[in-house]
A protein has these predicted regions:
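Bacterial Sec-dependent N-terminal signal peptides
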Residues: 1-29
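Acidic/polar surface patches and capping/hinge elements
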Residues: 23-239
């Protein structure tokens, strides 16, 4: 009896493992997370942290921002206010979604892509399996086959790139010390973010969107349009 129960348990566990490990989709349990609150821990010295990939945080030059009384900056403020004045309910939901944190959301996007591509291609007539080719990623079988080794490397590449990009971002934030638009003009709303004294330029959301999207485009070349759409979504949510 005990042996039979053990066999039944083992078979059930195996079936469950196969079923969930090969799913193309994942459930989202974080849609209603509150906005990330880092006002009390700005890590203003983060620009001096040791990088992983970059030799220095200023390896890539970020141009000096325009003065807050310049015509271009005032035009940008007016554009922000115009955008904020006509927000739809869908846009407000997107703002709330990204307010939970770019690192979290891009990790979830990555999980979605890994799950989608975590299925081996269908076998050929002779019983052999075709191999995805990075040289021709748009032909069947689609590249990549995101098996555990590929997925682990992909997560590592993106995490390291995000880390270095944010260190560089913080380096220039403290260098230029540009106040956030809502501090320059009180009529600008701080939608989806907790007000703080963190310098606003360059935008950490724009940096996060840029580095995450470009890395994912290389790792999942058949998803370029989807990845670019998510990057633009994060950038607009910050406005």
């Amino acid at each position: 009896m005990k042996k039979g129960m053990l066999i039944l348990f083992t078979v059930t566990l195996t079936i469950s493992f196969v079923q969930f490990s090969c799913k193309k989709s994942i459930s989202d349990r974080t849609a209603d997370l509150a906005a990330l609150n880092s006002a009390g821990n700005l890590d203003l010295n983060a620009g001096a942290w040791k990088t992983v990939l970059l030799a220095r945080p200023d390896t890539f030059v970020v141009a000096t921002p325009a003065a807050t009384n310049s015509t271009g900056y005032i035009a940008d403020l007016n554009e922000i206010k115009g955008y904020q004045h006509n927000l739809t309910s869908q846009q407000k939901d997107i703002i709330k979604y990204w307010a939970a944190g770019g690192v979290l959301r891009w990790n979830e996007i990555m999980r979605t892509l890994v799950a989608k591509y975590n299925l081996p291609p269908y076998q050929n007539a002779d019983g052999t399996y075709p191999i995805p080719s990075s040289a021709n990623p748009f032909a069947y079988p689609l590249f990549p086959f995101s098996n555990p080794p590929y997925a682990a490397r992909a997560y590592g590449y993106i995490s390291a790139a995000q880390y270095d990009a944010l260190i560089a971002c913080w380096f220039y934030k403290t260098k230029y010390n540009r106040a956030a638009p809502y501090k320059v003009d009180s009529s600008v709303q701080a939608n989806g973010v907790v007000r703080s004294d963190l310098p606003a330029y360059p935008s950490e959301a724009a940096v996060m969107a840029g580095v995450s999207a470009e890395m994912m485009k290389m790792l999942f070349p058949d998803e370029i349009a989807y990845i670019q759409q998510r990057a633009q979504e994060q950038e607009l949510a910050t406005i």
